[in-house]
Amino acid sequence: KLAVVSDTNTVEAMGRRVAKELSGWADVEEIIFPGNTHCDEPTIALMKDRTRHCDGCVVVGSGSLSDTVKYATFEDGRKYVSFATAGSMNGYGAGTASVTLANGYKTSVSAHAPRAVFVDLGVSAVAPPWLAAAGLGDSLCRPTAQVEWWAAHRLLGTSFAQTPFD
């Protein structure tokens, strides 16, 4: 059984179509989260609970929803694939997830990469423009963050790990 996870912003854009196409060869359950879903500890726990009876997940959405499914399936040892609906981040295929902790801090945590990432350019092209702007910012800041972390390690002796950048 597959869980096709989308949100109220992406279910009509692509979620329902993906679920319909997959239902031809697998038992599919559509799970729809609110459009303002954040990747935080309570939402990850809810995702694990709502998808626990499924063998794998198909996420149809942008950054927060994708990271929520990514981390939930990582913790459960299940596989997932991603249908990106906007160019809002550069981490769809990454082995890390951005999670907001209980203390309010957002951090990158080890997770696992999807088995595949699919992008329908027609869907991404009509996504709100601010999502594309966010993705550009995400892509531009990554190398700067890597250099700053490495420099702090070399100059101040703080820890450094290459893994998030691989």
Residue ranges and their predicted role:
Residues 51-85:
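A short, small-residue-rich loop immediately preceding and capping a beta-strand
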Residues 75-165:
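A glycine/threonine-rich phosphate-anchoring loop and its flanking beta-alpha core
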Residues 1-56:
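ATP/NTP phosphate-donor binding region
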Residues 6, 61, 119:
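Short beta-strand/turn micro-motifs composed of small residues
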Residues 17, 46, 71, 135-142:
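Alpha-helical scaffold segments in soluble metabolic enzymes
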